Amino acid sequence: MNMLECTCFYFSTNAAVPQQVLEMEELRALTTIGIICEYDPFHRGHAHQFAEIRRIFPDAAIICLMSGCFTQRGSPALFSTSTRAAAALENGADLVLELPTAFAVRDAEHFALGGVSILERLGFVDYLSFGTEDELSVLKPAAELLEEPDEAFQSRLRSYLAAGLSHAASQGKTLEERFPEAKEAFHRPNNILALCYLRALRRLGSAMQPLPIRRKGDYHADTLSIGEFPSAKAVRASILAEDWTAAKAACGYELPRSPICPPTALDQALLFQLRNMTPEELRGYAYCTEGLENRLLFAAK
């Protein structure tokens, strides 16, 4: 099934699921796989995930819940929502929905929770597929512990936080102690997000089953390597450098040359806004606490 005529359906954080989606009986009749993604841009690594899903479930429908104009990095996406949705559809997705910005720019836990909650509300997604660097048997017990931590775990976590470590680092070190045979797994970026997906499924009591796909290549490398699966970061760097030959090789298709929104596109507007704000106003924004507002204002001078 290929719904190239479908465009993105847009959600607000409190909106009901669009009736057009709920009435797609052809999706309800199939095994349906959900993917929470950004596709900035869609590249061969993402195509590998599609291929693995099709290998396991040849007749499955793939639904992509994709970030819109802004990504989890906090910067605008290089390509428009419609351009990225079209790339996903042309490479095998059956439907693309937009992940609300309120979830798309959040930390990993809330990015995952927001995405999983929307796929759950559709009512016909059977599996949640995501990339990992380790097996599900390593990650699932850790996710269960994070979602329902015992007092010993919480005590060790608090001790690392009190020592000045970030929450992510503290969590990773505490998991290392509990699962020493898999200690490296808890610091790998795709595993960290995978843990959040598993926690979200458990928290929501979802009937969706996890479908992890092992990642190939370094998905966070700064440069492209011939013959390897690329990182989105390296692909974006080649695009910004206008190395379209390398970008095409990494993505497997001809990328549109315009319009592109570079990460610096909003710099002047952001600086203007920051230079006209007070610390009290900045503290009204999510996560802008513990002196971060002062550091931002100092950097904006």
Please describe what each predicted stretch is.
Residues 1-6, 11-12, 17:
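Short terminal hydrophobic/aromatic SLiMs and anchors at protein ends
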Residues 26-84:
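N-terminal catalytic cores of NTP/NDP-binding nucleotidyl/phosphoryl-transfer enzymes
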